[in-house]
Curated annotation (Swiss-Prot):
This is Lys-gingipain. SUPFAM superfamilies: Caspase-like. Residues 25-228 form a propeptide. The lineage of its organism: Bacteria, Pseudomonadati, Bacteroidota, Bacteroidia, Bacteroidales. It comes from Porphyromonas gingivalis (strain ATCC 33277 / DSM 20709 / CIP 103683 / JCM 12257 / NCTC 11834 / 2561). Only retains 40% of activity after incubation at 60 degrees Celsius for 10 minutes. Proteolytically cleaved into a catalytic subunit and three adhesins. Arg-gingipain is involved in this post-translational processing. Optimum pH is 7.5. Activity remains high from pH 6.5 to 9.5. Loses 60% of its activity following incubation at pH 3.5 for 5 minutes. Disulfide bonds: none annotated. Ca(2+) 1 binds at residues 313, 482, 491. Pfam families: Cleaved_Adhesin (PF07675), DUF2436 (PF10365), Peptidase_C25 (PF01364), Peptidase_C25_C (PF03785), Propeptide_C25 (PF08126). Keywords: Calcium, Hydrolase, Metal-binding, Protease, Secreted, Signal, Thiol protease, Virulence, Zymogen. Ca(2+) 2 binds at residues 337, 339, 341, 343.
Length: 1723
């Protein structure tokens, strides 16, 4: 109905509380309710109360007292004295009658007169929100107030209420208080012990009914039952799929399809029916009968629907008139058992047309799939307690404050909570447009509006919250009355297109003040007092934030209705009743949606790479409690729920029988959905990683995983033909012993004549050159029968014999032999019967078919595959690691490979862009790769960090040079307002570090301790620290005062502390703690002022007395600003008792990067001298400059603060024309400057300016940002200088304050005194700089990537060079790394010409006396390319010379591949891009002028050159194809006269244009090569491209450069040895590179380790232990572990652990610059 806005004084209503109260202490230490010994037969319960509170109230009937007990509710007959009672909802087994036996209690009488209390007030009926308070009578039963003696209910009462989703519900009421109204006395029965037995209970039927009806989606409701623990041991808990019955109007069939498809993908088994089906029908009776039958049939089959979706308005599904409300209700479609408790979650997607239904569905799909472009709106909420002069201060405000205090706050992830507990409400609904995830209004309403503040249906239609859809709850009258003649408020809210809500919870009839209050916060004792979590039952707010529950829109409504049921009374009409509220409240929209609570979490999951066919189930890893579904094309195949270990067994109701892509959807309350596709097919034989996890910290992503199982993935033998005559074998790889190798010979009828191969191995390796000839066949004709057995210990096949016609050969297939690892001679033979020869296979493959002294390494498999090679044959050898670790890991982000070759089971990537990313890890084996295992990661924030600008890249030879401009073109673009560096980060994974301090201030022997999972799990980790207020193992109650103190910190500018905290038990959560900072010491007395102090509250499930530690509380992140100078931080656990543990984890402290603001007072400067630490410039050169003045020296001077100022004069005994600069020190990062100035009031016009410089301190570096000419009295009179006295007059003006904003990039500030003369002075004092971001260039650094791999970080310069880059195209990228994140990468492509710069070979380092001698072999004998030029730049390449010998101004140039010169069309057939060209005619206007070119194009120096190849071309038309050129060489210089012709030609036309490749030998001594264009005129031009010059090795065409520990120590060497004098005693890394004329080779490096060191008599500054094969080095420095080949195996600081194989190792430790080396033998 339409509501009136009532503004009525409280005195006009029945009662009005005011703050006069008293508390009566009872005979119990605490108020507590417990349920124990719970079973299907009985349970025990105890109730104790520690106080009764009396509050004086004024009513229309007089003054009374209200009595309350925490956790109890007001009861009584209307008009009779009101007393509190405790009410619990209990589960009753099938067939049982609950019987209560009181075992014991205490009883005490209290005289209220002693407390000055009035009579207890009469109990009043509930008030509808539609009632006019003026007309509500105050009910007073005079007879009840004349009755003598104690009056009250029986101590215990039980009432059966009905059956709710398979559980019979009863109300257990405890009435602890009786009242003698005449004597004004209370009788309180306390410490009540009872036993509730279930007589006639049928346990089997109870369990059967529960099993048949159970769904995890009803846990929210089950958790409100007092004795719920009897149902927790449910074996099939995670095998129950979600089922939904859908009944829809026939007109919605098409519009409903996308929603049905999604629900099936999500894992809902759908049973969909329409009203045009005969069994459904169109009447209310037929639809209800159909639904009831469906539910009962489903219950009988243990497949009862969880949800009932009604689709359409009342024209297709009418609903019916409520028995209690007399308004339309859908309750009885789902209340199947004949009572008022529903069996299904019911919601109505009310739409009058398919278009309106589509509007609802579109919003639901975006919300559930989380595809909204900006999810940040989910972190915002709107809470409104509407206007009502009486009830708003008694109920409305308390409701909203409860929500904010416990849930809608920063601790729960909300960034903005728009709370309006009372007027004014200005602009409150504007937040719906900007975006909120939740909106709640409680007060008055009408069928089409929230009343005050008013939001009408028309205004809802004008909302603009596109893509920001929310859940709305209206605790008010009639806003969900869906049979109203026009769409009701809730219908409009859900039906509007691209705006409004995806679901609305509201009441169809009038709602009631008290019941709506209970509905929201839970049933509680008294109005007008702020409710507490502990003093209320579970309400809808509490249920919304239950952890690990399937919280849906429907379950929120159920929780509210159960709270109203909880508060209901027995045997009286005090309240409107629970039945009314179950009829009243409805969900419009999709009630099966699980609302997000602020920003949803990211699910941790692992998907199989494929789904094998015909399996009954699949295992999928996901966060515990996740619901996992597999479907295809909208058809659901199977579902499962992830158990506590995070494994979901997806049971398939429809098996996969076809290949294709199948949808996998993972959902969980308050988690982002996972929506993926998996290919169905045969499983991969290659095992993937397991237990992949992904965590984020800022923009850093960390992946961790477990290695594949020890049994290697190549588990079955497989033979694959991969080409004609090419055969590959894959087989198990871990089937040899540690000292063995496997040799495999494979072939596929290579010659097509069934002649195959044999493999002969000589373990003595002494047959090569004799039995095995270096060339030619093994033998011809007949060989000795014992040739093989006498010389070859191992054969493939095992029965191979020396007969050319033998069948004991490998023709097609493979053979193998296992041999001891070691050195062998071998050969692979091939018989040729026609010639009688036993050939040794040719060398056409990648491995010789005969070998002298080949090493077969233990633990490896060698596969020799025979193949045709032209007219001959050959072998390709593939080597596999035969150990279980013969694989590496490859990491992908968003489908792109970002790292490969990993051997560790962890990976970190910093600077990841904000947003959602998919990371995948695959295992790369020798013979194949595993399926990818993937994880979704959400990186918070936005890419707001400025990138570099104007990045360029160039290459000369193999050297790449990058150049760029700083971000935003400024030296300090850091967008982070509070940058800093991490000073401390501790996760307590290895306990409490020794550098931390603990203080047990209460001395009970129980301080902070380390804890580990599973008992005490850390935040996203195993470890944390904890402190106890209750000890297990008989310790009992503790009163802790425990300090946990960080190591010493250096925070001159303060910092920011973040940490995670939680209660170890959510049911004993009230742990009190504080955070302190000390700038002095780390004793308890040094910590005085708390920066943060709070008591943890449970915010999770509540339960009766339980085993402590059973339900860990919710981890909450806290942030604390630390003051400047903080040296220590302390976490103090105190003022707590009888709870359990407080847990602490992930402590991180970041130092503020911001420089402290500072003020220059000039007090440290000297009178008459330039100010200290400032720079002055006397730009006018008159010898008068800025200087310090002291009021102690000049009596006319008054400083602004202190005694000193600075001054500049325009008159100082004489007229001056000043141009004086006063320049600050470096103030990079300053954003403002505030200062004070004064002038002579008599001569006030001294002009000055404030100037800034972004570069240096020269006068020309500064620009004006502010200037002024001061005003004054202009009264003339005395002027004053350094040598004058005031004589009593002080004409100095007052001090004037100015503040000037400084532009970004300001480095220096100057005060310039100029543009004035013959006045007097300007004074400055107290100059204050306000600093912004971090002031130094280390605000950010640059990171350089090549081809996706990070190659350099920490750069501060805007240039980078890399030498020795491999040939080919490369992508270079530069990103800016800020303290708070990284910028997007800016990239450029750079091409390195394919010139081969061969490195040295076989570098070795050996000691010789006190020296280190390096030896190496020269690069490969083929010198390789000395020059390779493709002219792809836009100018003549660097190093080349273009010589215009004829002097006409026309020379060689670079042109594109196709161009037009008038009518002379030129087409370059040489390449697809640029060429070098010289012209023989010149276009001027419309005519060509002839040229007579004599142009030289000269290469860089190419000493040692032997051969040149190039491409030469002429235009594509015959009449202009006769240009002449010559190839010339010089053995001296680059003048034209230095060159001699070695080849020349006149071009001739060929079809399509000339495209000629020339290859010419170059004479010995060639230094330069030139292309000379001459002896032609008036043709067009000559084009040259792709010039390659190679050398053979003579001549000094390269030199060697030697590096020690990264530093160049010698260059220009031509010998292949180098002696490093005096360096043999310490370990070093030596590298040698080859420097060619056009570039350098890659470095080749070796680690030198001395044989030993002198005995050290002093104690070694490290410890070295070997346990088994694990080497552990601990030191206060660096440690490195090497093998005897000098390869570094492990390195690190402080502690290095390495698991070795058998053999010898060297350990080097460097402490304080001194090296120590030890050798180890590992058996």
């Amino acid at each position: 109905m339409r509501k009136l806005l009532l503004l009525i004084a409280a005195s006009l209503l029945g009662v009005g509380l005011y703050a006069q109260s008293a508390k009566i202490k009872l005979d119990a230490p605490t108020t507590r309710t417990t349920c124990t010994n719970n079973s299907f037969k009985q349970f025990d319960a105890s109730f104790s109360f520690n106080e009764v509170e009396l509050t004086k109230v004024e009513t229309k009937g007089g003054t009374f007292a209200s009595v309350s007990i925490p956790g109890a509710f007001p009861t009584g007959e209307v008009g009779s004295p009101e007393v509190p009672a405790v009410r619990k909802l209990i589960a009753v087994p099938v067939g049982a009658t609950p019987v209560v036996r009181v075992k014991s209690f205490t009883e005490q009488v209290y005289s209220l007169n002693q407390y000055g209390s009035e009579k207890l007030m009469p109990h009043q009926p509930s008030m509808s929100k539609s009632d006019d308070p003026e007309k509500v009578p105050f009910v007073y039963n005079a007879a009840a107030y004349a009755r003598k003696g104690f009056v009250g209910q029986e101590l215990t009462q039980v009432e059966m209420l009905g059956t709710m989703r398979g559980v019979r519900i009863a109300a257990l009421t405890i009435n602890p208080v009786q009242y003698d109204v005449v004597a004004n006395q209370l009788k309180v029965r306390n410490n009540i012990e009872i036993e509730v037995s279930f007589q006639g209970a049928d346990e089997v039927a109870t369990q059967r009914l529960y099993d048949a009806s159970f769904s995890p989606y009803f846990e929210t409701a089950y958790k409100q039952l007092f004795n719920r623990d009897v149902y927790t041991d449910h074996g099939d808990l995670y095998n129950t799929p979600v089922r939904m019955l859908v009944v829809a109007g026939a007109k919605f069939k098409e519009a409903l399809k996308p929603w049905l498809t999604w629900k099936a993908q999500k894992g809902f088994y759908l049973d969909v029916h329409y009203t045009d089906e005969a069994e459904v029908g169109t009447t209310n009776a037929s639809i209800k009968a159909f639904i009831h039958k469906k539910y009962n049939d489903g219950l009988a089959a243990s497949a009862a629907p969880v949800f009932l979706a009604l689709v359409g308005d009342t024209d297709v599904i009418s609903g019916e008139k409520g028995k209690k409300t007399k308004k339309v209700t859908d309750l009885y479609y789902s209340a199947v058992d004949g009572d008022y408790f529903p069996e299904m979650y019911t919601f109505r997607m009310s739409a009058s047309s398919p278009e309106e239904l589509t509007n609802i569905i579109d919003k639901v799909l975006m919300y559930e799939k989380a595809t909204m472009p900006d999810k940040s709106y989910l972190e915002k909420a709107l809470l409104i307690a509407g206007a009502d002069s009486y009830w708003n201060p008694k109920i409305g405000q308390q409701t909203i404050k409860y929500a904010v205090q416990y849930y809608y706050n920063q601790d729960h992830g909300y960034t903005d909570v728009y709370s309006y507990p009372k007027a004014p409400y200005t602009g409150c609904y504007s937040h719906l447009n900007t975006g909120v995830g939740f909106a709640n209004y409680t007060a008055h309403g009408s069928e089409t509006s929230w009343a005050d503040p008013s939001l009408t249906a028309t205004q809802v239609k004008a909302l603009t919250n596109k893509d920001k859809y929310f859940l709305a709850i209206g605790n008010c009258c009639v806003t969900a009355q869906f049979d109203y003649p026009q769409p009701c408020f809730g219908e409009v809210m859900t039906r509007v297109k691209e705006k409004g809500a995806y679901a609305y919870i509201g009441s169809s009839p009038n709602s009631y003040w008290g019941e709506d209050y209970y509905w929201s916060v839970g049933a509680n004792a008294v109005f007008g007092v702020q409710p507490t979590f502990e003093g209320t039952s579970m309400g809808s707010y509490d249920a919304t934030f239950l952890e690990d529950s399937y919280n849906t829109v429907n379950s929120i409504m159920w929780a509210g209705n159960l709270a109203a049921t909880h508060a209901g009374n027995i045997g009286n009409i005090t309240h409107i009743g629970a039945h009314y509220y179950w009829e009243a409240y409805h969900v419009l929209g999709d009630g099966s949606v699980m609302p997000y609570r602020a920003m949803p979490k990211t699910n941790t999951y692992t998907l199989p790479a494929s789904l094998p066919q015909n399996q009954a189930s699949y295992s999928i890893q996901a966060s515990a409690g996740s619901y996992v579904a597999i479907s295809k094309d909208g058809v659901l195949y199977g579902t499962g729920v992830a158990n506590a270990s995070g494994v979901a067994t997806v049971n398939m109701t429809k098996q996969i029988t076809e290949n294709g892509n199948y949808d996998v959807v993972i959902t969980r309350s308050n988690y982002l959905p996972v929506i993926k596709q998996i290919q169905a097919g045969e499983p991969s034989p290659y095992q993937p990683v397991s237990n992949l996890t992904a965590t984020t910290q800022g923009q850093k992503v960390t992946l961790k995983w477990d290695a594949p199982s020890a049994k290697k993935a190549e588990a079955s033998r497989e033979v694959k033909r991969i080409g004609d005559g090419l055969f590959v074998t894959i087989e198990p790889a871990n089937d040899v012993r540690a000292n063995e190798a496997k040799v495999v010979l494979a072939a596929d009828n290579v010659w097509g004549d069934n002649t195959g191969y044999q493999f002969l191995l000589d373990a003595d390796h002494n047959t090569f050159g004799s039995v095995i000839p270096a060339t030619g066949p093994l033998f011809t004709g007949t060989a000795s029968s014992n040739l093989y057995s006498a010389n070859f210990e191992y054969l493939i096949p095992a029965n191979a014999d020396p007969v050319v016609t033998t069948q004991n050969i490998i023709v097609t297939g493979q053979g193998e032999v296992v041999i001891p690892g070691g050195v062998y001679d071998y050969c692979i033979t091939n018989p040729e019967p026609a010639s009688g020869k036993m050939w040794i296979a040719g060398d056409g493959g990648n491995q010789p078919a005969r070998y002298d002294d080949f090493t077969f390494e233990a633990g490896k498999k060698y596969t020799f595959t025979m193949r045709r090679a032209g007219m001959g044959d050959g072998t390709d050898m593939e080597v596999e690691d035969d150990s279980p670790a013969s694989y590496t890991y490859t990491v992908y982000r968003d489908g792109t490979k970002i790292q490969e070759g990993l051997t560790a089971t962890t990976f970190e990537e910093d600077g990841v862009a904000a947003g959602n990313h998919e990371y995948c890890v695959e295992v790369k084996y020798t013979a194949g790769v595993s399926p990818k295992v993937c994880k979704d990661v959400t990186v918070e924030g936005s890419n707001e960090f400025a990138p570099v600008q104007n990045l360029t890249g160039s290459a000369v030879g193999q050297k790449v040079t990058l150049k760029w401009d700083a971000p935003n073109g400024t030296p300090n673009p850091n967008p982070n307002p509070n940058p800093g560096t991490t000073t401390l980060s501790e996760s307590f994974e290895n306990g409490i570090p020794a550098s931390w301090k603990t203080i047990d201030a209460d001395g009970d022997g129980h301080g902070w301790k380390p804890g580990n999972a599973p008992g005490i799990a850390g935040y996203n980790s195993n470890g944390c620290v904890y402190s106890e207020s209750f000890g297990l193992g008989g310790i009992g109650v503790l009163t802790p005062d425990n300090y946990l103190i960080t190591p010493a910190l250096d925070l001159p500018n303060g910092g920011k502390l973040t940490f995670w905290v939680c209660a170890q038990d959510a049911n004993y959560a009230s742990e009190h703690y504080a955070v302190y900072a000390s700038s002095t010491g780390n004793d308890a007395s040094n910590f005085t002022n708390a920066l943060l102090e709070e008591t943890i509250t449970a915010k999770g499930v509540r339960s009766p007395e339980a085993i402590r530690g059973r339900i860990q509380g919710t981890w909450r992140q806290k942030t604390v600003d630390l003051p400047a100078g903080t040296k220590y931080v302390a976490f103090r656990h105190f003022q707590s008792t009888d709870m359990f543990y407080i847990d602490l984890d992930e402590v991180e402290i970041k130092a503020n990067g911001k420089r402290a603001d500072f003020t220059e007072t000039f007090e440290s400067s000297t009178h008459g001298e330039a100010p200290a630490e400032w720079t002055t410039i006397d730009a006018d050169g008159d010898g008068q400059d800025w200087l310090c003045l002291s009021s102690g020296q000049l009596d006319w001077l008054t400083a602004h603060g202190g005694t000193n100022v600075v001054a500049s004069f325009s008159w100082n005994g004489m007229a001056l024309n000043p141009d004086n600069y006063l320049i600050s020190k470096d103030v990079t990062g300053a954003t403002k400057v505030k200062y004070y100035y004064a002038v002579n009031d008599g001569f006030p016009g001294d002009h000055y300016a404030v100037m800034i410089s972004k570069t240096g301190t020269n006068a020309g570096d500064f620009t004006v940002v502010f200037e002024e000419t001061p005003n004054g009295i202009n009264k003339g009179g005395a002027r004053f200088g350094l040598s004058t006295e005031a004589n009593g007059a002080k004409p100095q003006s007052v001090w004037i304050e100015r503040t000037v904003d400084l532009p970004a990039g300001t480095k220096y500030v100057a005060f310039r005194h100029y543009n004035c003369s013959d006045l007097n002075y300007i004074l400055l004092d107290d100059i204050q700089f306000t600093m912004g971001g971090s002031p130094t260039p280390t605000d950010y650094t640059y990171t350089v990537y090549r081809d996706g791999t990070k190659i350099k970080e920490g750069l501060t310069e805007t240039t980078f060079e890399e030498d020795g880059v491999a040939t080919g195209n490369h992508e270079y990228c530069v990103e800016v790394k800020y303290t708070a994140g990284v910028s997007p990468k800016v990239c450029v492509n750079v091409t390195i010409n394919p010139t081969q710069f061969n490195p040295v070979k076989n570098l070795k380092a050996q000691p010789d006396g006190g020296d280190v001698v390096l030896k190496w072999e020269a690069p490969s004998g083929k010198r390789g390319e000395l020059l390779n030029e493709d002219f792809e730049g836009d100018a003549i390449p660097t190093g080349w010379t273009a010589l215009d010998a004829d002097g006409d101004g026309n020379n060689w140039d670079i042109t594109l591949n196709e161009f037009t010169r008038g009518e002379r069309h030129v087409l370059s057939p040489l390449r697809a891009s640029n060429v070098a060209i010289s012209y023989s005619s010149l276009l001027q206007g419309q005519e060509y002028l002839p040229l007579t070119p004599n142009n030289f194009l000269i290469t860089p120096k190419v000493e040692g050159a032997k051969k040149i190849t190039y491409k030469v071309g002429s235009p594509g038309l015959p009449q202009w194809s006769h240009d002449h050129y010559a190839l010339c060489i010089s053995k001296s210089g680059t003048a034209a006269a230095d060159f001699e012709v070695i080849f020349e030609e006149t071009m001739t036309y060929t079809q399509g244009g000339a495209n000629l490749t020339r290859e010419k030998d170059l004479p010995a001594g060639t230094k330069y090569v030139a292309f000379r264009h001459y002896n032609c005129t008036d043709v067009l031009g000559i084009m040259i491209d792709d010039v390659v010059i190679t050398g053979e090795g003579e001549g000094p065409s390269y030199t060697y450069t030697v590096y020690r520990d990264g530093t160049k120590i010698q260059e220009g060497l031509t010998e292949t040895t180098y002696r490093d004098a005096g360096m043999s005693a310490q370990s070093h890394e030596y590298c040698v590179e080859v420097k060619y004329a056009a570039g350098v080779s890659p470095k080749v490096c070796v680690d030198y380790i001395p044989d030993g060191v002198a005995d050290v008599t002093a104690q070694k500054p490290y410890t070295l232990t070997v346990v088994g094969k694990t080497i552990t080095v601990t030191c206060q420095g660096e440690a490195m572990i090497y093998d005897m080949n000098g390869r570094r195996l492990a390195a690190g600081r402080n502690t290095v652990v390495y698991t070795a194989q058998g053999g010898y190792y060297a350990v080097m430790v460097v402490v304080d610059g001194k090296s120590y080396v030890e050798k180890l033998a590992i058996k």
